[in-house]
């Protein structure tokens, strides 16, 4: 009996080493391949500015009704430095979107392999694999066209961004340009639209609610679908527990706390229904 147990333990340890080795080698191959391709096509890539915040400072688009009243302002982005954004939100968005953000260099090979396995082998499509830096590159420099060429350039731009800017600068730029639904681009506008407060004032639950939105801005925002929003926020909070940002008690307290959603202003602007 002891011989069998020893044999099984030996097999398990061997398989563990094999899997870890496979993942490591695959990661090295991916990183090396991307590096080689980068030097081949780097002249075709967009130029990165000296300061990422300048890209976010685009003039907003105003939508008017037939009688000349402003119905909605799209792309109204007031840039917030990281110290003006709730630490709860910073931790929440990292936990749910890119848990290895402070460890990778723009690309997370393990996440890509995991996403490939779940999407291809198991037939699931919920797994993305894109890091925060990749998402930033896509949102700032590329269209949302789905093609291998666009994805490759996105990866290369992510490397370039990581080699040019610090992690806080990248996180700050991401928080200021990501789309939160309801015409809200950036954390400042999202905080005002959904909760009527500044980003620094967001509670833990409100931070989780906002961090949950970018995955599906129109379906998982608290104005369109409060139940789905809270369900997704519960998952975000669990990810924060998994990453050691909060404990189970804090998660439970957050889910019991008051959300204080700002009501959609449909009575004053009934035409805004067509803008959702």
Task: Label the model's feature ranges.
Residues 2-276:
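Juxtamembrane regions of bacterial inner-membrane/periplasmic proteins
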């Amino acid at each position: 009996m002891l011989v069998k147990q020893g044999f099984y333990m030996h097999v398990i340890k061997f398989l563990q080493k094999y899997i870890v080795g496979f993942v490591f080698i695959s990661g090295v191959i991916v990183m090396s391949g991307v590096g080689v391709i980068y030097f081949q096509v780097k002249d075709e890539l967009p130029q990165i500015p000296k300061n990422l915040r300048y890209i976010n400072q685009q003039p907003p688009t105003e939508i008017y009704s037939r009688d000349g009243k402003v119905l909605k302002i799209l792309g109204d982005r007031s840039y917030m430095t990281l110290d003006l954004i709730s630490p709860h939100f910073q931790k929440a968005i990292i936990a749910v979107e890119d848990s290895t953000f402070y460890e990778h260099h723009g690309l997370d090979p393990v996440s890509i392999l995991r996403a490939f396995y779940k999407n291809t082998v198991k037939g699931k499509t919920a797994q993305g694999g894109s890091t925060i830096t990749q998402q930033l590159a896509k949102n700032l420099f590329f269209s949302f066209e789905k093609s291998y060429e666009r994805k490759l350039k996105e990866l290369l731009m992510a490397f370039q961004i990581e080699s040019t800017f610090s992690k806080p600068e990248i996180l700050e730029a991401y928080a200021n340009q990501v789309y939160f639904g309801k015409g809200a681009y950036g954390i400042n506008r999202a905080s005002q639209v959904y909760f009527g407060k500044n980003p620094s004032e967001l509670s833990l639950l409100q931070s989780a609610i906002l961090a949950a939105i970018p995955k599906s801005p129109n379906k998982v925002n608290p104005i369109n679908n409060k139940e789905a929003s809270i369900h997704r926020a519960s998952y975000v909070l669990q990810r924060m527990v998994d990453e050691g940002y909060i404990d189970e008690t804090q998660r439970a307290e957050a889910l019991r706390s008051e959300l204080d959603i700002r009501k959609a202003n449909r009575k004053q602007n009934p035409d805004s229904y067509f803008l959702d």
